[in-house]
Amino acid sequence: MIDDGIIAAIASGYVESAIGIIRVSGKNSIELLKKIFYPKKNTFEPYKIYHGFLKDSNQKIVDEVLVSVFKSPHSYTGEDSFEINCHGGLLIMQNVLDLVLKNGARLALPGEFTKRAFLNDKIDLLQANAIVNLIKAKTQKALDIAFGQLLKKNTTIIEELREKIIFLMAENEVLIDHPEEDLSDVDLNKRLLILNEITKLIQKLLKFSEKGKYFFEGVNVAIIGKPNVGKSSLLNELTGHNRAIVTDIPGTTTDIVSETLNLNGIPIKILDTAGIRKHSNKIEYLGIKKSHEAIDEADIIIAVFDSSRILDKNDEDILNIIKNKKNVLIVLNKSDLKRKLLLPLNIDPIEISCTKKTGINTLKSRLYNMLIEDYNESEVVSLNTSQIIALKSALKHAKKIKKAYIDSLDPALISIDLQQLADYIEQIIGKIENEDILDNVFKNFCVGK
């Protein structure tokens, strides 16, 4: 059952500003407004802004305000609602909120306005995620992707998934209702083909949700190498800031130095690590220990080598560290000097010179391509943890159904798994009956959203 009681919150954030916004929504919220707001005329037409004064029960003026009125179902929540634009002082905003609460509203929970929008069919869960990402976005590309998801421009894969599952369910019902009909090899092959397509679509959706995660949560990139190969210089060149100290003395960097780079819309946190070698003192040991921790946590590793020196034991240690890592870029610095370094034939290095500032754009391009691969902006979606779990469960069920068809199991049994598969896909959009799951989805929203 949907709670349609009146809720209220400071939507503009509890910070001092020129204007504060108090959002109010729920059944009879307009009646509440009439108790506390005194405009020139006391009849409220929706989608208009009214000037007037807020007064308490003693007719004391609380603030001079502008009020926007919205009528159900044409509001953010789908309910009658209004927003008060007051002066943005902390005390004034709190006084206005207290006035609303004293007259029948309760304080909204985090994300409760958006939860009501979802429950009233104003948005689906993909759009709810998009609203969070609009707020979190740190780059223009992230904003573009979030707006695309909010406007349902990038839900093609999900709609295609639903259509294919519905087709299989309909075909299976025919077999249940008419058991005398034999399942021909042609029909079986058609079903298996569709299941293969469903599997590929789910895998594609999981992949593109991972790409979406990069744009909103960012990527950790660790620069590693032995001392004095130019790791700090590379950090400075990549970010365009002299963030790290650069000297000719090996082992200058003893702690992790980080800086953020906006790489074509992807926020990248670049970590300059301490040079990895056999440590000479406790401080260097701690720095190297942190370097190994950064390597384990990194999404991508940039391993830097000095091309002007022959391969030594410390370089070999670096190669051993990265040999089983998935996303690694090998960089040969000091390419302006005579090359003496020889690497294994299976390595495709990127040659740069931090001194001459060459090769940096090539490195950035390789880094970006490693992240996005065959990324298509129109297909990238942002999913929360629950939705990703549902997708992975759907993938398992699709494979289970395929085996059931091959083994000629009873269509009635297959029907159960098809329904479960459909339910998992519906969870991505938002067909969720469990209130606890819904609360978990919306608890990460800010208060007033």
Task: List PLM regions with ranges.
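Inter-motif core of Ras-like GTPase G domains
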Residues: 284-308
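Short beta->alpha junction loops/turns
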Residues: 25-26, 89, 250, 307-308, ...
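Conserved beta-strand segments of alpha/beta enzyme cores
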Residues: 106, 267-269, 348
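C-terminal-of-GTPase-core extension/linker across diverse P-loop GTPases
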Residues: 2-10, 14, 55, 140-259, ...
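Generic enzyme active-site microenvironment
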Residues: 270, 304, 331
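Switch I (G2) and immediately adjacent beta-strands of P-loop GTPase domains
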Residues: 51-71, 251-279, 297-300
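A glycine-rich (often HGG/GG-containing) alpha/beta subdomain
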Residues: 1-144, 148, 152, 163, ...
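Glycine-rich, N-terminal phosphate-binding loop of Rossmann-like dinucleotide-binding domains
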Residues: 88, 238, 273, 305-308
